[in-house]
A protein has these predicted regions:
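Secretory-pathway glycoprotein ectodomains that are cysteine- and/or Ser/Thr/Pro-rich
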Residues: 2-222
Length: 222
């Protein structure tokens, strides 16, 4: 688990993010309380203890396995990066061991959730993928065989402050699921409130024991 704290003009904002590990026989589903901190010093070292309440479930079945990589300014895996500059191209490579479905969301510094995949041209709200096939999303040149080039949404990272942190949620399941209800915004991906996104995600993960979520953190600087 990771807790991220940002201080802006004397106001502290806290985000709690759960990152699954292969040696943990459980999966974090939802945070239901604000983290509580205990700060102390021992032998000149800063010690921070954190406690948080939430919902989790036992892993009782073999999970769908997938690999997702954030790519900067290139579509090959050697371009994997979590550090972007404003204006950089954003791509994502994805490969799953099983056929199924995938969605991608971005959470920005302002706590807005943006649906990056399915693309805005999607009519059924889901993206079906084949097993053992490498896909690169957000590039019209790699649209085939899932999409036509004109259907692809391409993205350049932007930064209004000196530096920003974004969270990329890659959601994968062998079972069909449909994107969250969202709103069209001119010049931006479809958008919904972060709280509504979390409710949608928790509902789907509770209903689908095979659904997996990987959260990737990227920084964007001017």
């Amino acid at each position: 688990n990771a807790t991220l704290m940002n201080n802006t003009n004397g106001s502290t904002q806290t985000d709690f993010t759960s990152l699954s590990s292969s040696d943990v026989k459980g999966e974090w589903l939802e945070t239901i309380s604000e983290p509580k901190y205990e700060i102390s010093y021992e032998q000149g070292m800063l010690i921070v203890k954190c406690a948080v309440s939430g919902k989790a479930r036992e892993l009782v079945a073999t999970q769908n396995s997938f690999v997702a990589k954030i790519l900067r300014n290139g579509t090959e895996d050697r371009f994997e990066s979590d550090n972007f500059k404003s204006g950089d191209d954003f791509y994502l490579s994805y490969q799953s061991s099983t056929k199924g479905y995938v969605a991608v969301y971005l959470i920005d510094d302002s706590k807005n959730a943006y649906c990056l995949l399915p693309y805005q041209s999607s009519q059924d709200g889901k993206v079906r993928v084949d097993a053992n096939t490498r896909y690169v999303f957000f590039n019209s040149k790699t649209a085939a065989p899932l999409f036509q080039p004109a259907d692809v949404d391409e993205y350049n990272m932007t930064c209004e402050k000196a530096a920003e942190t974004n969270y990329i949620y890659v959601i994968s399941s062998p079972n069909p699921f449909i994107k969250a209800i969202d709103n069209a915004v001119a010049g931006l991906p479809r958008e919904l409130k972060y709280e509504d996104f979390q409710k949608w995600l928790t509902k789907n993960r509770t209903a689908d024991k095979d659904m997996q979520v990987e959260i990737k953190t990227i920084s964007v600087k001017k």
